């Protein structure tokens, strides 16, 4: 029972941290205004990890490589802690190549979950409270993902099914990535 609770807590903490780091990289790529209150909160939560890493890896023109590296390192730590909680030990040397690859798939899983929740939040807010102060940020973050789907889907006269299509797509991809990630590392 304690291992289940420990695994649950490790999953929550590292998934949230990794997802916030991915969102930080995404917001950087979209050039969202850094003084946005949501961006400021994200920076405050993640600066303890990103700022020291920035001495080693600089942010690029388009991608914040430091935040992506920090998210990947969070995934590595998550997988190691999960293995230790479940088995009581972890042989890092024999499992290192698979661990590093599984961390990539874990980051992909977190990315797909982030897309799912942001699109769902934007869709719900557009129905419930379209004038919400967070809607401009949500629109700017989801537009690059939804616009290609909108171009393919037929116009239904005010009914936008692109969020539904993207939600289904992310769930299917998340199932595939999760299966691959957990088959790589014997946890």
Q: Which role does the model predict for each range below?
A:
Residues 1-187:
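Selective transmembrane helix interface/packing segments
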């Amino acid at each position: 029972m304690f291992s289940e609770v420990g695994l649950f807590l490790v999953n929550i903490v590292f998934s949230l941290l990794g997802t916030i780091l991915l969102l930080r990289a995404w917001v950087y790529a979209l050039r969202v205004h850094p003084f946005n209150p949501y961006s400021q909160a994200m920076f405050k939560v993640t600066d303890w990890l990103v700022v020291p890493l920035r001495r080693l890896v600089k942010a690029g023109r388009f991608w914040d490589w430091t935040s992506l590296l920090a998210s990947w390192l969070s995934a590595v730590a998550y997988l190691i802690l999960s293995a230790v909680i479940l088995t009581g030990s972890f042989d890092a040397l024999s499992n290192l190549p698979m661990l590093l690859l599984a961390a990539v798939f874990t980051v992909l899983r977190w990315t797909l979950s982030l897309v799912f929740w942001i699109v769902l939040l934007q869709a719900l807010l557009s129905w419930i409270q379209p004038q919400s102060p967070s809607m401009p940020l949500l629109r700017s973050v989801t537009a690059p993902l939804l616009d290609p789907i909108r171009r393919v889907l037929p116009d239904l006269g005010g009914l936008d099914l692109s969020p539904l299509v993207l939600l289904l797509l992310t769930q299917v991809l998340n199932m595939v990535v999760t299966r691959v990630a957990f088959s790589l590392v014997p946890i």
